[in-house]
Design a protein with these regions (language model features):
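N-terminal donor/sugar-recognition subdomains of glycan-related enzymes
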Residues: 1-26, 31-43, 58, 86-91, ...
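Acidic/Gly/His-enriched mid-domain segments of enzyme catalytic cores or analogous surface patches
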Residues: 42-45, 51-135
């Protein structure tokens, strides 16, 4: 992992400086997201997360930032990841996604995306974990 250049303060400052609206909308997947008026999405900077970018693109809305946090999305919908990444102004990928990507995808991520250190690791709950949290 020593060759990974993680997002830093300068990158964050650049993202902030490149905003075109005062407000930024974080657009997630789900039925309530689609209740957001298109007029609002068209006039604000939008951060799309995982598969939510499809809805935006289907309405000709380019996301300010595309964020991929779920490695399963990359494995199951790789072509969509590339499409969403290439059609957004910026792409941020969680390091967990990078670590589980193919070598080809890792090269793409390092060349075209900002890589974010993990705040937490997604874990599957097993019997021991469930017992641990119930005690």
């Amino acid at each position: 992992m020593k060759n990974i250049r993680y997002i830093d303060k300068k990158d964050v400052e650049n993202l902030i400086e490149s905003k075109t609206s005062d407000d930024v909308i974080i657009f997630l997947s789900g039925p309530t997201s689609q209740k957001t008026p298109l007029s609002v999405l068209q006039t604000r900077d939008v951060i799309a997360v995982n598969g939510s970018a499809q809805y935006l693109l289907s309405h000709n809305i380019i996301s300010y930032n595309y964020v991929l946090t779920d490695v399963r999305f990359l494995h199951q919908r790789r072509d969509d990841f590339y499409k969403f990444s290439q059609r957004s102004r910026y792409t941020i990928v969680n390091v967990d996604v990078y670590e589980h990507a193919s070598e080809e995808d890792k090269r793409y991520i390092l060349q075209n995306c900002l890589v974010l250190r993990s705040f937490y690791r997604r874990e599957k709950g097993g019997l021991i974990k469930k017992i641990k949290f119930n005690i």
